[in-house]
Amino acid sequence: MPRWIHAFVILVLSLSGGFANAEPGPLKLGVGLFQPDKEKNDATYRPLADYLAKRLGREVKLFTVDTWEGLAKSLANGETDIALMGPWGYVLANHSAGAQVVATILYDGKPEYFAIIVTNPKSGINSIQDLKGKTFAFGDKGSTSGYLIPSYHFQKQGIDPDTFFSKVIYTKHQAIETQVTRGELDAGADYNRNRNAMIEQGLIKAEDSKIIWQSDPLPNDAFAVSADLVTNRALVNQLQAALMAIGAELKQTPNLLPAHYVGFVAKDNSFYKPIRDAGLATGKLAPK
């Protein structure tokens, strides 16, 4: 064998060995804006990112995405690899880009939560029909409880928000609760977990917020992986195992998840069928 060919073969083998032994790049973890601001959100979910990094043996970078719609898009376009996201955001990412859920978060031990409509007790509003001609706020259009589910309920009641309300705005869940309690907004869509958290944190008072409608139980937030990672079964299995172990880990590390979150349970795409059905029924999800 000519000397130059021998040298070339050695070079190729050494490079391929180097690639084989190269450490995997960081995983990008996206989370929605569950807390009032990005800084608090990052501080709340950084322990989860650090825990996953330790369990997976690779760096996990945390990204807070301002909107639920934006979080769904980030998982679809590669800006994030894994995400803790609302049910509607997950369904959007699954429908458009093949993202897959690996686990559902448990809130007070249950994989479910509720969409609600809140008003100020002093408003005199006691039902959805009382909202005619009033101001109303939805969450962003990637929100399950703040947009999809109340929109679906209004549709079933024959209510067109654009004509039924005097004014409709789209804003963050925390802003909806704050403006309702101050009397700056007649009513708005939210979810029970957010209202509970804001009351416990002293951000609003329970006596200033009244629930006038509550949905049927909804599947809780999804921990999902991008379509690119779905085929990496070893990593997906490792990630799922790490999430399943969080419940026990919370005993040693209570700040691993926010208050009331007690771990994860394994779920698949079928668990989110009620959200998908609502998206299809309202025309916000195109049939395949």
Predicted regions and their residues:
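Extracytoplasmic small-molecule ligand-binding "clamshell" domains
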Residues: 23-89
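A structural signal for short loop-to-beta-strand junctions that line the ligand-binding cleft
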Residues: 99-109
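Flexible hinge/capping segments at coil-to-helix
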Residues: 119-139
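Pocket-lining segment of extracytoplasmic ligand-binding domains
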Residues: 135-234
